[in-house]
A protein has these predicted regions:
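N-terminal export/assembly segments and adjacent metallocofactor-ligating motifs
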Residues: 2-309, 335, 354, 460, ...
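A glycine-rich phosphate-binding loop feature that marks nucleotide/adenosyl-phosphate handling sites
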Residues: 168-169, 317-320, 374, 417-427, ...
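Active-site phosphate/pyrophosphate-binding segments
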Residues: 333-334, 338-454
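Short beta-alpha connecting loops at secondary-structure transitions
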Residues: 282-288, 548-559
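Long, well-ordered, tryptophan-enriched scaffold segments
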Residues: 262, 273-377
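Phosphate/diphosphate-binding loops
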Residues: 507-508, 555-574
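Long, contiguous, secondary-structure-rich segments that constitute the structural scaffold
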Residues: 566-616, 708-710, 714-725, 729-814
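Extended redox/cofactor-interaction regions of prokaryotic respiratory oxidoreductases
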Residues: 2-7, 182-270, 277, 295, ...
Length: 814
């Protein structure tokens, strides 16, 4: 169905209230057009009138950012300029068919990213201090020469382990242009041709859940497709907010709503913040203190066990460590889960609803009611987003939440789930090969600032170094491709700033990006990248329910200014480094695409020819199994299809974790345990630091941005203002009214931003949407609302991941 914008809408003046209303109803249609809005700062690019010229071309492109989905965009081009953007018009509106994949307000504003005043125009080198944003223009030849010469020098002096590829997800889903995982990028291919680089494991999105549930299920914890909710009777979401994080027609929220219409399943949301996933569509919202999800689960488990609401047959057949019958011989007496819950374990504390209530803030009677509902309603889709795991106790919390699905036997069945985040059907499309990294050493993606500061001191047992016992050298060079984690998305910005400012520590930082981001200001050499609209690639889906798809992301316009593609940049560098043939294999970017497409057609015979696909724009295929069901084969035959855990079963008790707990060097307050227990972790609401900083600060993914991407699009910033959310009770104590400027502060930094006083926040908790662009004044007080000024670089115990939601702060009116 083609999107049409009525003339009356184009002619009307839009108020902010009207804009917000339009956002809710129609996905911010004006962001996809060039409608001029009455805001003070608008990214004026070109004449915004919708063209009627006969020479208009409609070219397929894509939004390839890190929301979890990818969306097709149909660009209307006249005289080489994008005039307006529409989304998918293929397929139908039938949920059970090949439905349309409609972009959200972010993707529809792509034109404003392409023509944004912040676009990088030409190569530059730093002339001021890192972070000042002072650069001078240089030629591409000079930029290539500086990078190649200095990289060769650093490799000669320190070895390839001193070269680091930083985390970046600004360009996701592509076969050629993808920026994540860094090990699968063209920069990695270049480095692998030159002897390799220091790799990293984990990611800022899901480090703790990936590590925690690995010890429960083995490998990445899979989940049922959200489309399978049509077979569910109950949906329970822990910190899972697809209504804002994955809100497009290709994302989870579409499947959640459509599937619930079929099943009429009750939906319960457990979150400190009343999210847009609820917004009147949920049946119950249960606010909870951040970081206490495991305590809630333990209280629920107590009711289920004492009232015989657990699936004992499932626990006996498929699990290790629920009770004494399946407890490993190596475990201590009463070291099983049931003993821990009933107070018969080492701590001697029964995890009653009253015990859980004191910790979580959830009333005991509500815990009892919820336990009975979960224990008596089957199948139940129990899932967790990646918010609960982004805590100091994140790994152990993810294992605890998954226990609800395990206790009730909802794993491996239609309408159930594993307790992990939802999964999806995917196509075996072939991506660009990046060769093998000769360097086997890796660090946590969150520990790179420590690797600059104290690299040779970092060990396997204390800092999570993998591949060897310790690092030999510090990081001396950083590649930062399509990522804002150099400063904006990394925790404790003020500490990072101090480390990066000393260019005798990390001697070379190369940033490749499209815009002058907060991280770009810390570059030594700054290279202007092409947007997705300025080059050809294939864009692949991710969280797409049970209909997988591939988008032909064609070149819509010529590269602006002096921008070049990542393939051209890395090919030119390969030439200077003497590895051009090995890197390119004699192919151009389009030739690589045709080569990869031919390989993909062998795996997916239904794909049309390259030229037909280019015209078609998008290829869609539904899951032939109907719905993806995680661990279905294991459930049907655990002997023939064991899990990849040491026992081949679901490990409630993990001997591997017991061994780690006995050997790793952990700071005081960090806990690794073989059972999914509750431990508060550092800087919890129970921490003595609470007397000085009495409010918990948590983050959330805001609908106007994808992390920091789109954070410089003024129409989105105006429609969805960056504000600190605070409960009226906490605001009243501090004399704060809605819209007041407040200071949020702790020992790590200070942020000034407007307050949003709302009952949608739990008392005692404040929240900032993550991803706002860091904007410090001369005293390094941030005026942009960037949460990472206030977060800590102390890593989580097991994954060594980012505990971005574990923060204590104070808030005062400015």
């Amino acid at each position: 169905m083609k999107t049409k914008i009525p003339d009356a809408v184009l002619a009307a003046e839009v108020s902010r209230r009207g804009l917000v209303k339009t956002t809710a109803i129609g996905g911010l249609a004006m962001a996809s057009s060039a409608l001029t809005l009455p805001f003070s700062r608008i990214a004026h690019a070109v004449d915004s009138a919708i063209p009627t010229k006969s020479d208009e071309k409609v070219i397929w492109s894509a939004c390839t950012v890190n929301c979890g989905s990818r969306c097709p965009l149909r660009m209307h081009v006249v005289d080489g300029e994008i005039k307006y953007v529409e989304t998918d018009n293929t397929g139908d509106d039938n949920y059970d068919g090949l439905h349309q994949v409609r972009a959200c307000l972010r993707g529809r504003s792509m034109r404003r990213r392409v023509y944004n005043p912040d676009r990088l125009k030409y190569p530059m080198k730093r002339v001021g201090a890192r972070g000042e944003g002072k650069f001078e223009r240089i030629s591409w030849e000079e930029a290539y020469d500086i990078i190649a010469t200095n990289m060769q020098r650093l490799i000669k002096e320190y070895g390839n382990e001193s070269i680091y590829l930083n985390y970046g997800t600004g360009t996701l889903g592509g076969t050629m242009t993808r920026s994540w995982p860094p090990g699968n990028t063209l920069v990695a291919r270049l480095m692998n041709c030159c002897g390799g680089y220091l790799n990293h494991y984990g990611d800022y999105s899901s480090a703790q859940i990936a590590e925690g549930l690995n010890y429960t299920y083995g490998g990445w914890a899979d989940g049922n497709s959200p489309s399978d909710i049509e077979n569910s009777k109950l949906v329970v979401l822990f910190g899972n907010n697809p209504g804002e994080t994955r809100m497009s027609g290709g994302g989870v929220t579409y499947y959640l709503e459509q599937a619930r219409q079929k099943s009429n399943a009750r939906m319960i949301i457990i979150d400190p913040r009343y999210t847009d996933t609820g917004a009147g569509r949920e049946d119950e919202w249960i606010p909870i203190r951040p970081g206490t999800d495991a305590a809630l689960v333990n209280g629920l488990a107590y009711v289920m066990i004492t009232e015989n609401l657990v699936d004992q047959a499932f626990l006996d057949k498929y699990c290790v460590g629920y009770d004494e019958k399946t407890l490993p011989a190596s475990a201590p007496k009463n070291g099983h889960y049931k003993a821990y819950i009933l107070g018969e374990g080492p701590d001697g504390v029964a995890k009653t609803p009253e015990w859980a209530s004191q910790i979580t803030g959830v009333p005991a009677d509500k815990i009892i009611k919820l336990a009975r509902e979960i224990g008596s309603t089957k199948p139940a889709f129990i899932s967790q987003g990646w918010g609960p795991q982004r805590h100091a106790n994140g790994e152990i919390a993810t294992r605890a939440i998954s226990m609800l699905a395990i206790l009730t036997g909802n794993v491996g069945i239609n309408g159930g789930n594993s307790g992990a985040r939802e999964g999806s059907y995917s196509l075996p499309f072939v991506r660009m090969p990046t060769l093998e990294n000769p360097i086997q050493t890796s660090i946590s993606m969150f520990m790179w600032t420590d690797a600059i500061e104290r690299g040779p001191e970092m060990t396997a047992l204390r800092d999570g170094v993998r591949g060897k016992d310790k690092l030999d050298v510090p990081i001396k060079m950083i590649w930062n491709y399509a990522g804002n984690s150099l400063i904006n998305q990394h925790s404790e910005i003020n500490r990072t700033h101090e480390i990066l400012q000393d260019d005798k520590k990390c001697e070379l930082i190369v940033v490749i990006d499209c815009h002058m981001t907060s991280s770009a200001k810390y570059a030594d050499i700054l290279l202007p990248d092409c947007t997705a609209s300025e080059q050809m690639d294939f864009a692949l889906d991710a969280s797409c329910g049970n209909m997988s798809y591939v988008i032909f992301n064609d070149q819509v316009i010529k590269p602006r200014f002096e921008c070049k593609t990542i393939y051209e940049m890395t090919s030119e560098l390969a030439k200077r480094l003497g590895v051009e043939q090995q890197f390119t294999e004699g192919r151009t970017q389009e030739e690589w695409m045709r080569h990869l497409y031919a390989q993909s057609r062998e795996a997916i015979p239904e794909l049309p020819t390259f030229e037909e696909f280019r015209k078609q724009g998008i290829f869609k295929k539904r899951d032939p199994q109907g719905h993806h069901v995680a661990y279905k084969a294991f459930r049907e035959d655990p002997q023939a299809n064991p899990l990849t855990t040491p026992s081949g079963k679901i490990e409630i008790y993990s001997q591997a974790l017991a061994d780690i707990a006995a050997t790793w060097e952990l700071p005081e307050g960090d806990v690794i345990d073989p059972l999914p227990i509750y431990t508060p972790g550092f800087e919890s609401y129970q921490d003595p630091l609470n007397k000085q900083y009495p409010l918990q600060l948590t983050g959330f993914h805001y609908k106007s941005r994808v992390h920091s991407t789109y954070g410089n699009v003024d129409v989105l910033k105006a429609a969805c203002r960056q504000e600190m959310w605070i409960n009226p009770l906490d605001a009243q104590k501090r004399g704060i009214n809605n819209g007041d400027k407040v200071r949020i502060f702790n020992d790590r930094g200070e942020v000034h931003i407007e307050a949003k006083v709302t009952p949608r926040m739990m008392p005692g908790v404040v929240a900032l949407g993550e991803g706002a662009w860091y904007d410090p004044d001369t005293k390094r007080v941030d005026k942009g609302g960037c949460i990472n000024v206030l977060t800590t670089q102390r890593p989580s115990p097991l994954a060594k991941g980012n505990p971005s939601h574990t923060n204590l702060v104070q808030v005062e009116k400015v």
